[in-house]
C-alpha cells in the first residue's frame, strides 16, 4: 500500500497557546519501505504517527492510501481500514493478563469475527521465537517475549503496514536488540512496510529511509 502525505499539518490551541506539532509535511511511503523517525521528546513524532494511521485528524493537508483520501472517510470506514491495513506495536505491550499468548495474538481476529489461519499463525510465531510459549499467560513471559507476542498480534490480520512507537523503549539492551532484529526479519521475510518511531539510534540506523523531526518539521536525513 502506497501512502502519500501532502502538506500535512497539525496545530493545537490558539493565539499565545498555539502549538504547531507538525508543519506541512510532504512525503511518500512506498510498499516495502522500512522507515525510522527520530527526534527529541515533544518534537511531533507521535503526532505524525497518529495522523499517518488515521487515529487523529490533521488541521490541514491530505493523506492518501493508494490514492484514497482517508480523511474523506467516515470514522467507521477509517476504523475498518485501520483494522484491515495497519498493525500497531507500542512501548507498552497491552496484553490482556487473563489471556494466553495465543489468545492475545488472535484478539484482533476475534474482534473482527474472523477465523485464524493456523499455518500463518505457526509461521509467524516460529519466526518470532514464541511458538513454544503460546499457552503461557503474560506474567509467565519475559519482557522481550511479551513484546514478541504484541508484534505477532499486530501482524495476525496480515496488514500492509506496521507502525511501531518506541517498540524497544520498555526493554533492556539485550531484549531490545533481539526485538529490533525480529522487526527487521519481518520486514525482509514478510515484505511488510515498517514505520518505526524510536530514540534508539541502533534501530534508526537499520532503516532503509531515515527521517528526523524537530519542532514539527520533518526532514529525510538518509538511509542504508
Regions found by a protein language model. Name each.
Residues 2-213:
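ABC family nucleotide-binding domain
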Residues 210-222:
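H-loop (His-switch) and adjacent beta-strand-loop-beta switch element
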Amino acid at each position: 500500500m502506497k501512502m502519500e502525505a501532502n502538506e500535512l499539518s497539525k496545530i493545537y490551541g490558539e493565539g499565545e497557546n498555539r502549538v504547531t506539532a507538525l508543519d506541512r509535511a510532504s512525503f511518500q511511503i512506498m510498499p516495502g519501505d522500512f522507515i525510522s523517525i527520530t527526534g527529541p521528546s515533544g518534537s511531533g513524532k507521535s503526532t505524525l504517527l497518529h495522523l499517518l494511521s488515521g487515529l487523529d485528524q490533521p488541521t490541514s493537508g491530505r493523506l492518501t492510501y493508494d490514492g484514497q483520501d482517508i480523511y474523506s472517510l467516515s470514522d467507521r470506514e477509517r476504523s475498518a481500514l485501520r483494522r484491515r491495513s495497519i498493525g500497531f506495536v507500542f512501548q507498552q505491550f497491552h496484553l490482556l493478563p487473563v489471556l494466553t499468548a495465543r489468545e492475545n495474538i488472535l484478539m484482533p481476529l476475534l474482534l473482527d469475527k474472523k477465523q485464524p489461519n493456523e499455518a500463518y499463525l505457526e509461521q509467524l510465531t516460529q519466526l518470532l521465537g514464541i511458538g513454544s510459549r503460546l499457552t503461557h499467560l503474560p506474567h509467565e513471559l519475559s519482557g522481550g517475549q511479551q513484546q514478541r507476542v504484541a508484534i505477532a498480534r499486530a501482524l495476525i490480520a496480515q496488514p500492509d503496514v506496521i507502525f511501531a512507537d518506541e517498540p524497544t523503549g520498555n526493554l533492556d539492551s539485550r531484549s531490545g536488540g533481539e526485538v529490533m532484529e525480529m522487526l527487521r526479519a519481518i520486514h525482509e521475510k514478510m515484505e511488510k512496510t515498517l514505520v518505526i518511531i524510536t530514540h534508539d539510534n541502533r534501530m534508526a540506523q537499520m532503516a532503509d529511509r531515515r527521517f528526523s523531526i524537530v519542532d514539527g518539521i520533518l526532514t529525510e536525513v538518509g538511509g542504508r
